């Protein structure tokens, strides 16, 4: 028994010390009877805190990009980034884009450069500064061999760190100073919920231009109202009323817009969501037919789940009798192993297979234990374990044809 405990502890220490990094994604594309391969890889120099991301396309017309990212001594903050493109004629890497970032207390400054004749030329500069109660963001452009102010956004925060006032400025070249162009003022209720936003524009004087109101009506419905200031008064342009039907587990939102001829708000859209145990089961969208004075269904979506609350089917049907359906399969661990795409035949009313994706996982490794420094995996698959392979098929009416295959390679240290 003691030996088993010692072995378990020893194995646990090794497992904790082991680091798993995603190193590359190799994709094979099958088209016109030929295979084309692409490789997206990343390598990190721990000593120099430098990350290199390489993308290579092999085939009749080779193509490639390279990105080199330099971090600070702790390996956390990005200091610089350089991008290069592969020149098939010369076999060299040509400069494409560069950014240099510096940090000063609460300030972050990023200078960007574009390549002209393989030489770096200033492009844009971004300067952001945060304090306890404000945020400032300034944009510069590069002209006449120097950085020139272009625009500025200043945000004043309230005690809850929410927007209180937002001001936007443009740089006046002649006066060499910032010119305030517009501003927005936010108002909250005692519970800290947004109640009103008023936008102001500058003419001879500052005048209110647009107002967004959020409130609860006497029936308990949530209301969003959009108003414009015209001819000395506020005119409601559109309004959305959201009702929660707790008895039938429904959320109903009705949108109305101003009829410029009658000067009255008229129905335009109705959106109904139905829930079961807090899980969305159905969405139906209706539009208002002005001539028939009635709602017509534009779109309906139905969703189904398994006992683990995984979405296993999403079906959408449109007003032209077309439809699309996704079916998801999961393994016992909760990994999505297959996605099937089907289209609805408006004539036969039958679903026909069209595309399919299959995933393969390493069930011994958890997904959240994998380090992907450059985020080269953008698949966003629903999974618990580490992804090893992805296959993409299309259906030709008789059989499934493999069109793409991706392999995910890792480095275990």
Regions found by a protein language model. Give the residues of each.
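Bacterial Sec-dependent N-terminal signal peptides
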Residues: 1-21
